[in-house]
Regions:
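Peptidoglycan glycan-strand catalytic modules in the bacterial/periplasmic cell-wall system
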Residues: 49-51, 55-306, 312-315, 321-324, ...
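Short, glycine/proline-biased beta-turn/loop segments that scaffold the active-site neighborhood
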Residues: 257, 482-539, 612-627
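A penicillin-recognizing enzyme superfamily signal
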Residues: 273, 337, 341-357, 390-457, ...
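Short, well-structured active-site flanking segments
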Residues: 95-105, 184-186, 246-251, 500-521, ...
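Short active-site loop at a secondary-structure junction
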Residues: 71-76, 335, 445-451, 474-494, ...
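Extracytoplasmic/periplasmic proteins that interact with beta-lactams or build/remodel peptidoglycan
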Residues: 124-126, 143, 197, 205-208, ...
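Active-site-adjacent helix/loop patches that line small-molecule binding or acyl-intermediate pockets
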Residues: 125-126, 134-142, 146, 339, ...
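N-terminal type II signal-anchor transmembrane helix
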Residues: 1-55, 93, 113-116, 358
Length: 780
């Protein structure tokens, strides 16, 4: 008895001694567990400072790069159908429990452990699922780790219930859910899949979205339409089971198909979307590998950019203090760009006004009479089938389903079935809702004319405006930074620059006759004359030749200097694309990007200096510390005198030649120089023009070269591209961004004759514009 008492005393002694330490250890454990729990304010309003800001030259925010496309809504903005579907499916006792559903846990435990029925799920309430956002579960934590995680979720769920109403918890939950397709939160999901606000969702639409909550890929109606339909109908059944709708209504609604208006909303809206996309591409660029390039010139150009341009691949070149790479979507960077907000707005408006109000309507009228519209009448069936097949395989519909493992024949069969869809249109809404087959939608989109436009400031090289296409939401391809097209007569100023550099002058005279060459295969090649018959055989000046875009005069100059010298001059002035050194180069047989062409032309108003385009001046971290500052590289490409001679030559194009519409139709009075360009079959229309203050280039054409206007009356560069330039310049002048009083700076000692009056044949005021014979033919 005495020993038993002694043992009891000893036991309690050690309990009393160790209890404080055990309690302290437990408290320390709790502190460790919950020290990093975000506050409720952070849960309800996640910190947005970590979104990267892209800032215009005047301080305006163009956009933010962020990891989640999320817009928060209030409970009042939720459809009752959505509330009912969520509660019925995810947590039927949501209004009754206090964060943890004890009855639900017991039910799951009994059926899962005793009856081995794993279909009962994990018994998590909506509140617990919200708590999971605080503690994302990691793989490989083990059973003990999962116990701790579950404990955290339970405690946080109870804490949430004590501090928020049920309505607040429900809306926070719906704001936190990821629905796939870059849609975070219920508003983004509603807009992405149905183009509606959450308050507008019908029963079947709400059920579709709620069905995606736990497995957004498996039940995605775009990727897995059959599974999505089955899951949606399950949710509708749950709504009937929990008395939110009647059984009769449920059975009726289940018969309704899923009618999507699917449109991913990730960074599509806002100003300068093509520019922002180009910025992201360049900052994420990896070190160039030769195997990824067809031409050595392109590889060399990107390799030099990697070496000399810190912005190119910036995210792969720069590290945080801890050694990690910066993340464009969540590190709160501030990127200061050279884009001018008003110039950019004016550029996008100019594109919309010309293409939307005029050119596209004219093209649509032509297409009504084409058997194979939008393809030209001479396009054979094999070519048409190839272009359509390529388009199908590049479509989201095809790629998403192939990625999900759907057999190719099943996917292709869908392209002949009519479905509801939303397609781009030049109207106030920017789209139309219609019913057509996916094949017809491909033809619809191919019928839309594409464009590209970029404006670069002389001397600084700053990019001020950048439009990569007609509408970024529907046409992601960037025709400025990614595309290369045949350049037509816009190539001719490089040949004339070579002539001026070699000692010729604008008033030098030549006889206007066709020129023949021995082609590489030994045959004769004669560039087709684009001049009126009465002009042939006349003595003309070089200035007349460029003003009227005469192929005969360009061919004459090519004979004097050769294709190698011309290609070298183009590379010196900033063209880095591959150039075939052939005689046809003199009339535009080269594919070059718009940005290259504009940057090369920019050497002329920059007094002969080539300046690499610059579009970011500095990058700061989230605290305002400067991480990088950027300057461009400059080099003398041509002599200052040569540049001034070329300005004089190219002013003739605008004053009397194929660019004269800038004066007559748009009333522009300041000093302007430029060149139009049109390629074979009117596939490409160009205009690149510059003033003392800005150099701007515009290209317009079809997605494929086989899509074009029938004649030069509508398909010339002076009709397709030049009007965008004219509209944009008028808007910028009205905004006070430029002045018509600006003048090109002449060299200190001008000792050459620029007055060629009396040395040329007489032409109309608008010269070759009236003759409509600007088209460049490579072979006759």
């Amino acid at each position: 008895m005495e020993d038993a008492t002694k043992k009891k005393i000893t036991k309690w002694f050690w309990i009393l001694v160790t209890a404080p330490f055990a309690l302290l250890a437990f408290l320390l454990l709790l502190v460790w567990m919950f020290a990093k729990i975000p506050s409720f304010e952070e849960l309800e309003h996640p910190d947005s400072k970590l979104a990267t800001q892209v800032i215009a030259d005047g301080g305006e925010v163009l956009t933010t790069f962020h990891i989640e496309n999320r817009t928060f809504v209030n409970y009042e903005e939720l459809s009752p159908n959505l509330v009912a579907a969520t509660i019925a499916t995810e947590d039927a006792r949501f209004r009754k429990h206090s964060g943890i559903d004890t009855k639900g846990l017991i039910r799951v435990a009994v059926k899962t452990i005793l009856m081995r029925d794993s279909s009962q799920g994990g018994g998590s309430t909506i509140t617990q699922q919200l708590a999971k956002t605080l503690y994302p579960r990691k793989e490989g934590v083990g059973k003990i780790g999962m116990v701790w995680i579950k404990l955290k979720e339970w405690i946080t769920a109870v804490k949430l219930e004590r501090n928020y109403t049920k309505d607040e918890i429900l809306v926070m939950y719906l704001n936190s859910v990821f629905f796939g397709s870059s849609a975070y939160g219920i508003r983004a999901a509603s807009e992405t899949f149905f183009d509606k606000l959450p308050s507008e969702l019908t029963v079947e639409e709400a059920a579709t979205l709620v069905g995606m909550v736990n497995k957004p890929t498996r039940y995605n109606p775009v990727i897995n339409p059959d599974r999505a339909l089955s899951r949606r109908n399950f949710v509708i059944g749950q709504m009937a089971r929990n008395k939110y709708i009647s059984r009769h209504d449920a059975d009726s609604i289940k018969q309704v198909p899923i009618n999507l208006v699917y449109q991913v909303r990730d960074h599509n809206a806002g100003l300068a979307p093509y520019f922002r996309d180009m910025l992201r591409r360049d900052m994420n660029a990896e070190k160039p590998k030769r195997s990824n390039y067809q031409y050595a010139e392109d590889y060399t150009a990107d390799s030099l950019r990697w070496r000399d341009d810190e912005l190119f691949g910036w995210l792969n070149k720069n590290k945080k203090p801890g050694g990690e790479k910066y993340n464009l979507d969540k590190d709160g960077l501030r990127i200061y760009t050279t884009i001018n907000y008003r110039m950019q707005q004016n550029a996008e408006q100019a594109v919309a006004e010309h293409l939307g109000n005029n050119l596209q309507k004219a093209f649509d009228r032509e297409n009504k009479w084409k058997k194979n519209a939008p393809f030209a009448g001479d396009v054979d069936k094999a070519t048409r089938d190839r272009l359509m097949s390529n388009a199908r395989r590049w479509s989201d519909r095809y790629r998403l389903q192939r990625k999900a493992g759907v057999p190719e024949d099943e996917i292709l069969a869908q392209f002949d079935k009519k479905v509801k869809m939303r397609v781009f249109a030049w109207n106030k809404k920017g789209y139309i809702d219609t019913v057509m087959t996916p094949n017809d939608s491909i033809l619809w989109y191919k019928s839309v004319l594409r464009c590209g436009m970029v404006a670069i400031e002389p001397v600084t090289g700053h990019i001020k405006a950048y439009v990569g296409g007609p509408n970024y939401r529907y046409f992601k391809y960037d025709n400025v930074g990614q595309g290369k097209r045949q350049v037509g007569s816009t190539i001719k100023p490089f040949l004339y620059t070579l002539a001026m550099q070699e000692g010729m002058s604008p008033c030098d005279k030549v006889i206007n006759v066709p020129q023949s060459f021995i082609a590489g295969d030994g045959t004769d090649w004669t560039p087709r004359s684009t001049d009126k018959d009465e002009w042939i055989g006349k003595t003309v000046t070089l200035k007349w030749g460029l003003t009227h875009s005469s192929n005969n005069i360009s061919a004459y100059l090519m004979k004097q200097f050769g294709p190698h010298a011309m290609a070298e001059m183009m590379h010196k002035m900033g063209v880095y694309s591959h150039l075939d050194e052939v005689y046809a180069l003199c009339v535009g047989a080269a594919e070059i990007s718009i940005q290259e062409m504009v940057a090369a032309y920019n050497a002329l108003p920059s007094r002969g200096v080539y300046i690499t385009p610059l579009y970011v001046t500095r990058i700061e971290d989230s605290q305002g510390n400067v991480l990088s500052e950027f300057t461009n590289r400059k080099r003398e490409a041509i002599g200052e005198n040569t540049a001034y001679l070329m300005i004089n030559l190219m002013e003739g194009v605008v004053n009397h030649g194929t660019g004269a519409r800038l004066r007559s139709a748009y009333g522009l009075k300041g000093e302007i120089a430029g060149k139009t360009g049109t390629t074979n079959d009117n596939s490409d229309g160009w205009f690149i023009g510059y003033t003392p203050s800005i150099t701007c280039g515009v290209w317009v054409g079809g997605e494929d070269r086989q899509i074009h206007f029938n004649s030069l009356a509508l398909g010339s560069g002076s009709n397709m591209a030049l009007p965008i330039w004219g509209i944009w310049m008028k808007k910028c002048l009205a905004d006070g961004l430029f002045s018509e009083a600006d003048r090109f700076l002449a060299p200190a000692a001008v000792n050459f004759n620029l007055d060629c009056t009396g040395g040329d044949i007489e032409t109309t005021e608008e010269g070759q514009e009236e003759n409509k014979s600007e088209e460049d033919y490579y072979f006759e």
